[in-house]
From Swiss-Prot:
GO terms for biological process: isoleucine biosynthetic process; L-valine biosynthetic process. The keyword Hydrolase does not apply. The gene is ilvH. This is Acetolactate synthase small subunit. It comes from Buchnera aphidicola subsp. Schizaphis graminum (strain Sg). Its EC number is 2.2.1.6. InterPro entries: Acetalactate_synth_ssu (IPR004789), Acetolactate_synth/TF_NikR_C (IPR027271), Acetolactate_synth_ssu_C (IPR019455), ACT-like_dom_sf (IPR045865), ACT_dom (IPR002912), AHAS_ACT (IPR039557), AHAS_small-like_ACT (IPR054480). One of its GO terms (molecular function) is acetolactate synthase regulator activity. Pfam families: ACT_AHAS_ss (PF22629), ALS_ss_C (PF10369). It catalyses: 2 pyruvate + H(+) = (2S)-2-acetolactate + CO2. Pathway: Amino-acid biosynthesis; L-isoleucine biosynthesis; L-isoleucine from 2-oxobutanoate: step 1/4; Amino-acid biosynthesis; L-valine biosynthesis; L-valine from pyruvate: step 1/4.
Length: 158
């Protein structure tokens, strides 16, 4: 099952490496990871998406708490937070596909951020589910030349 952990840690050299090393040593895969400084530049917030059952996630959480740089670990619940991800896609366009690509992008409230004679670069923001739905439709419409996704960022509600 998909799980999200929010980790508050010291913004110091090696802190990220130690967290990733813990996952690697235990044989856990990181699906996505995002890290950025918080409003306090001495701290960073890391959002990790992984796959595992409740027992394995609890074990990861306990091990993370033991790391010296880690100040707080929170298991993010399904309805207790807001999450977003950004995706950039470079797609092939020709005269008959441009209108279709533009329409699909608008329906998903995305943007065309770059245009050449043969390609569009699209930007879509939303939940992972929304991005996956967009990908499924756009793949049936045109060729994807290149794609990148940011990974999940999230914040608690309220």
């Amino acid at each position: 099952m998909r799980r999200i952990l929010s980790v508050l840690l010291e913004n110091e050299s090696g802190a990220l490496s130690r967290v990733i090393g813990l996952f690697s040593q235990r044989g856990y895969n990181i699906e996505t990871i995002t890290v950025a400084p918080t409003e306090d530049p001495s701290l960073s917030k890391m959002t990790i998406q992984t796959i595992g059952n409740e027992k394995s996630i609890e074990q990861i959480e306990k091990q993370l708490h033991k790391l010296i740089d880690v100040l707080r670990v929170i298991k993010v619940g399904q309805n207790s937070h807001i999450e977003r991800e950004i995706m950039l896609l470079k797609v092939q366009t020709n005269n008959c596909k441009k209108d279709d690509v533009k329409h699909i992008t608008e329906v998903f409230r995305g943007q065309i951020v770059d245009i050449t004679s043969t390609t569009y670069v699209l930007q879509i923001t939303g939940t992972a589910k929304k991005l996956d739905s967009f990908l499924k439709i756009i793949r049936n419409t045109t060729e994807i030349i290149e794609m990148t996704r940011s990974g999940i960022v999230g914040i608690a509600r309220g």
